[in-house]
Regions:
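Short, small-residue-biased leader/transition segments that mark boundaries at the very start
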Residues: 1-4
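Asp-box/BNR beta-propeller loop motif
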Residues: 19-22, 207-215, 324-333, 383
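Extracellular fibronectin type III
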Residues: 21-37
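N-terminal regions that are enriched for targeting/export leaders
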Residues: 36-180, 186-189
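Structural signature of eukaryotic scaffold interfaces centered on beta-propeller domains
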Residues: 83-92, 166-182, 227-238, 292-303, ...
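Conserved Ser/Thr-centered positions that define the repeating blades of beta-propeller domains
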Residues: 89, 131, 207-208, 258, ...
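Conserved blade-ending motifs and adjacent loop-strand segments that build the rim/top face
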Residues: 331-355
Length: 384
């Protein structure tokens, strides 16, 4: 194919290698201007909505289309999950995935054209469902949940106070999840007031029994104006990389990292300031690029040797797609992965780990109407 070149910053890259001959992305040193080859840019095509993951069949209810996307699961009947959003997915054990959902309502939930979004009874700030599905081409199958004592309801994991006054503990919303050293962690934001996405703090819960019981990690806490109030995690070369923003959808992404064993030791977190890693000083972090983002999802694709970042952009009203050879950049310009004018009231774009095998990108997207989650797919291809 044609090779496209442009003047850009040229980098020397220094790679640290540990005793197991594993490399670690640690730094890039800017030395001069040069020519960078952009011929192997990662592109996507053939975007599809594969299926709806959560909620009941709609079939014309409240004016919605008679034929909607196929629903793979009866979450309203089996787990009392009628309306929900997000679907942050990670791998607990090989082939066993957890999916964290946000504010969740029971089987009496119904999509409402006049006032879309949450409604109904049995409000839980978050729930955790499970999937062992290895073939997502026909949809994502849910086959379990962390249930309450009655065995009838998926239970709340991260406590939310349900105080809608705007001056207390409104709800607790998951933003990312990961397994580190055999323990599963969820990062969440504790919402004080949805007007302005004001939080009390962000923190972690952890589980040592594959997602059945969870406890709060009291020693990890991010303030209400932290650049890591909402995050996405990815493990690579012994590190967990954390891309985050101030809570909301109007802020630029920042980058941190820590060794896997230090996830509960916040003093060991390192923050990227544009030229190096700064330990223990969160305010040193500088933006990865100049673009506002919400509901980030980061992953490294080993076959394409590319980092992939998905996020909601409110200005363009889309799910944006960026790539980079190294997580510290240089990041590609945003591509429009999903158009909000085609999928109205869209948000969230959480990459399924199964995407990192092969050339199909699977991600979970939400729509405010009908306030449920969808499995999306796109084909990936690198320019030759």
């Amino acid at each position: 194919g044609d090779v496209y070149k442009r003047q850009s910053t040229f980098y020397f890259e220094f790679i640290a290698v540990d005793n197991n001959n594993q490399s670690s992305e640690i730094s890039k040193l800017i030395v001069n201007k040069g020519i960078v080859n952009y011929s192997r840019e990662l592109k996507f095509s053939n975007l599809k909505c594969v299926s709806r993951i959560t909620g009941a069949e709609i079939n014309g209810t409240n004016g919605l289309p008679i034929v909607e996307f196929e629903v793979n699961n009866r979450t309203n009947e089996l787990y009392n999950v009628g309306g929900t959003d997000l679907g942050i997915v990670w791998e607990l054990q090989p082939g066993h995935y957890g999916l964290f959902f946000g504010d969740t309502f029971g089987s009496d939930f119904y999509p409402n054209f006049v006032n879309p979004g949450p409604n109904g009874s049995n409000w839980r700030s978050n729930v955790l469902l499970f999937s062992d599905d290895q073939d997502l081409s026909d949809g994502l199958t849910i086959n379990g949940a962390t249930m309450d004592e009655s065995g009838k309801n998926a239970r709340e994991i991260c406590y939310g106070g349900k105080d809608g006054s705007g001056n207390g503990d409104w709800t607790s919303i998951p933003t990312a999840a990961i397994r580190a050293n055999g323990i599963d962690y969820v990062h969440y934001m504790n919402i004080r007031n949805w007007a302005g996405w004001i939080t009390n703090f962000s923190s972690l819960y952890k589980s040592s029994d594959n997602g059945i019981t969870w406890t709060r990690c009291q020693n990890v806490k991010f303030g209400s104006t932290s650049n890591f109030g909402q995050v996405s995690y990815f493990k690579k070369d012994g590190y967990i990389y954390m891309v985050g923003t101030i809570t909301g959808r109007d802020n630029k992404p920042h980058l941190a990292r820590f060794l896997e064993e230090n996830i509960e030791n916040q003093t060991e977190y390192e923050f990227w300031n544009g030229s190096g890693w700064i330990k223990g000083n969160e305010t040193a972090a500088t933006p990865l690029f100049n673009d506002i983002s919400g509901e980030l999802s980061i992953a490294y694709h080993p076959e394409f040797k590319k980092w992939i970042l998905l996020y909601f952009n409110s200005t363009r009203y889309d799910i944006s797609f960026r790539t980079a050879d190294h997580i510290i950049g240089e990041w590609s310009k945003p591509q429009k992965l999903v158009d909000g004018w085609q999928y109205s009231q869209l948000y969230g774009s959480y990459i399924h780990p199964i995407s990192l095998k092969g050339n199909i990108l699977y991600f979970i997207m939400s729509m405010w109407l009908p306030y449920n989650t969808y499995l999306m797919s796109a084909e990936l291809k690198c320019n030759p």
